[in-house]
């Protein structure tokens, strides 16, 4: 469903179901106090407002696509944040979506940002893997890297995921360690596919069928000027959100490619093997911190018990969805609060 007409003609839902669903979405868009949704499971809240049939036909497939079985312990604040973002992308209610992009992608943004801060005298070092963080008697903080080099700092900001924090920061208090260790994550496997021709005219296709091995189809060329930026080719992303312990992280790239492409061709019979120019796979085990019940109350502070050490990562996004905009805003708020 991509517009109001398709929504009204959607066969699996009765007229009453559609009214309840529309009311549910509209009501969620008007809620300002998101914290009151943190103590309600998303399943319970959606069933209350949309009804069981709509939950089974609409909400459950979408929740499982995004969260897997972890939806069962996710709070209603998650769906509130999702609906808020959906409304923010529309100019006039449900009439028109407004999406934008930066020509050149995030590489252009990062290159520009890097040049600016380097001109300010900042040194950027990449491929430095931190193994150990420790504060010394002189209050300086040292970071030991995998390449056996050591950096000494007055202040240090870590942006790494929670499961790594407690491994490299032994001086944190037990309370801090427990809080970080109790954060639950979802990981992602994402295939980037370059095609000779488009799959469809839609930017995002949410998948609700259990037999499909990926959870959505994001076709960038439906949003971006493909003639100008992709040489009239089509760039498609196929993400799959899973637990960090999921067996797919041990599956070979060849097996994932075979499974994903076969499914894509089943969904789009016009797609031939010759149409597939490039197929690349990215993996990340700790991407999205699950907003479990009363999540914001259990979240560790950005300022740690170690003077000068701050931990600021995507787990601190408590009233929004995980995306670049929210991440940048989080960084700006943290910098203004502690270093402004």
What are these regions (language model features)?
Residues 20-136:
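Active-site/ligand-binding neighborhood in enzyme catalytic cores
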Residues 50-59, 177-180, 270-277:
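Short, surface-exposed acidic
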Residues 236-237, 302-320, 326-330:
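Short FAD-binding loop at a beta-strand-to-alpha-helix junction that anchors the flavin cofactor
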Residues 327-340:
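Internal hydrophobic alpha-helix adjacent to the cofactor/substrate pocket in enzyme cavities
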């Amino acid at each position: 469903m991509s517009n109001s007409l398709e929504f009204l003609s959607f066969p699996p839902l009765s007229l009453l179901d559609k009214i309840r669903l529309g009311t549910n979405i509209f009501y969620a868009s008007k809620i300002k106090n998101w914290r009151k949704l943190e103590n309600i499971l998303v399943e319970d809240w959606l069933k209350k407002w949309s009804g069981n049939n709509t939950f089974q036909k609409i909400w459950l497939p979408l929740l499982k696509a995004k969260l897997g079985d972890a939806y069962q312990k996710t709070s209603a604040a998650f769906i509130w944040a999702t609906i808020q973002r959906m409304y923010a992308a529309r100019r006039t209610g449900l009439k028109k979506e407004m999406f934008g992009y930066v020509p050149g992608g995030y590489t252009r943004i990062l290159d520009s940002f890097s040049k600016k801060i380097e001109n300010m005298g900042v040194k950027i070092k990449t491929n430095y893997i931190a193994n150990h963080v420790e504060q010394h008697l002189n209050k300086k903080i040292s970071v030991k890297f995998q390449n056996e080099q050591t950096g000494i700092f007055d202040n240090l900001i870590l942006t790494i995921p929670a499961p790594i924090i407690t491994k490299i920061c032994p001086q944190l208090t037990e309370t801090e360690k427990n809080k970080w260790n109790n954060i639950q994550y979802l990981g992602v496997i994402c295939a980037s596919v370059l095609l000779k021709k488009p799959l469809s005219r839609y930017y995002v296709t949410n998948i609700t069928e259990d037999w499909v091995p990926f959870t959505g189809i994001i076709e960038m060329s439906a949003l971006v000027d493909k003639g100008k930026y992709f040489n009239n080719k089509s760039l498609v992303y196929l993400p799959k959100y899973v637990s960090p312990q999921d067996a797919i992280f041990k599956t070979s790239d060849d097996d994932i490619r075979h499974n994903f492409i076969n499914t894509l061709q089943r969904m789009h019979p016009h797609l031939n093997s010759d149409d597939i120019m490039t197929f690349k796979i990215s993996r990340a085990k700790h991407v999205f911190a699950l907003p479990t019940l009363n999540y914001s109350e259990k979240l560790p502070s950005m300022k740690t018990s170690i003077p000068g050490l701050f931990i600021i990562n995507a787990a601190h996004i408590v009233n929004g969805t995980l995306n670049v905009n929210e991440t940048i805003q989080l960084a700006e708020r943290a910098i203004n609060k502690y270093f402004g």
